């Protein structure tokens, strides 16, 4: 098979930002995305903008389609991989992703791989899998202050035409900045009343005492009519809560606006890596308080025990698809600092077994134990019983799969799901044996606060 080549043009990036490039390229585009990253207070080397959809891969109600045409399959992730994978000519100046597909896999995608009860309504009605193959990608190299316009393909004339179009858009004027208000102030309503959530926690504690599970994550969804443009939410969120996985994915029927703190799964095509995060403290006022809080976190038996449980779950998930003897735990139980909090983090890696792909690993890991519980299958059965609706995108993953199998998928947390004129925010609390129901309810609201603050900022005008 002939390799896909990165046809590209390179410019100085001193007159553009990822936001301005996105606004220029995405104007009137049916689908578009912006992926950025801020880790440990610093912007990562690359930001990526993509527009257009050469192909759209969609899964809903057991029907997998490519550009609207049905494809028969029992394994939608394998079907996606087989249609995306192609030999790729890499370039040393470009990041792991400059062509392939970008999108999300919902929490409920697990139903295609595990038998779970179907007790609750799917009120959002969104796809379980939705990925697009962009026509043009703009890569910002913040280290070298360069902007690469890339049109991946095999036909140089066709790729050059796409580059010409994108260059004209970039050199044109900045269009109107999305920020218009739909009117009114957001009024978020929870899908659980306070008492109903407390009762769900009490029932979860009964399951824990009976020995069914060690932990289950019960989430609360907050919903409001949309009052601002989704991109205004993104601009506010990147200011309020800069995170390792910033994402704005306008996929047509749904928009994801994310400031996720957590990687679900990364791969270079052969090696797979997951990084469970469990255990949290706020950042200190200064370096000395930071150090004290980190030491306190490492001494907290409850936090450490919960982390070790989820670390074991991640190790088992990777072990299902890795070659024998290749699963390793790197840097177990170390403290990482983020903009507002610090977390206990471990790294688990393995080498894919013969015949396994990165998307087989995604099927094994999804959903992560940090959003479901342990043991995972029984915890998900209890979630289906106790939560009022299907979760949809929340608790799943979003990110990219490059043509050659390189992949980076984040956990869909701290994310607005915008669809059908509504915006939804969902947050969960891990219920364990000594949980206090009232505190778990407050934890859900506390986790949602950064997103609610972003709504207020966007409504006030940026």
Swiss-Prot record:
Enumerate the residues binding Mg(2+): 306, 443
- Per UniProt, chorismate binds at 279-280, 394, 414, 428-430
Q: Which reaction does it catalyse?
A: chorismate + L-glutamine = anthranilate + pyruvate + L-glutamate + H(+)
A Pfam family cross-referenced in the UniProt record is Chorismate_bind
Which pathway is this protein engaged in? Answer: Amino-acid biosynthesis; L-tryptophan biosynthesis; L-tryptophan from chorismate: step 1/5
The EC code for this enzyme is 4.1.3.27
Q: Which GO biological process annotations does it have?
A: L-tryptophan biosynthetic process
Characterize the regulation of its activity. Answer: Feedback inhibited by tryptophan.
Q: Which UniProt keywords apply?
A: Amino-acid biosynthesis, Aromatic amino acid biosynthesis, Lyase, Magnesium, Metal-binding, Tryptophan biosynthesis
- Report the cofactor remark: Binds 1 Mg(2+) ion per subunit.
Which cysteines bridge via disulfide bonds? Answer: none
Q: Cross-referenced NCBIfam families, in alphabetical order?
A: trpE_most
> What is the recorded function of this protein according to its Swiss-Prot or TrEMBL entry?
Part of a heterotetrameric complex that catalyzes the two-step biosynthesis of anthranilate, an intermediate in the biosynthesis of L-tryptophan. In the first step, the glutamine-binding beta subunit (TrpG) of anthranilate synthase (AS) provides the glutamine amidotransferase activity which generates ammonia as a substrate that, along with chorismate, is used in the second step, catalyzed by the large alpha subunit of AS (TrpE) to produce anthranilate. In the absence of TrpG, TrpE can synthesize anthranilate directly from chorismate and high concentrations of ammonia.
The Swiss-Prot or TrEMBL record describes its family as follows: Belongs to the anthranilate synthase component I family.
- Record note on quaternary structure: Heterotetramer consisting of two non-identical subunits: a beta subunit (TrpG) and a large alpha subunit (TrpE).
Q: What is this protein called?
A: Anthranilate synthase component 1
Q: Which organism is it from?
A: Thermus thermophilus (strain ATCC 27634 / DSM 579 / HB8)
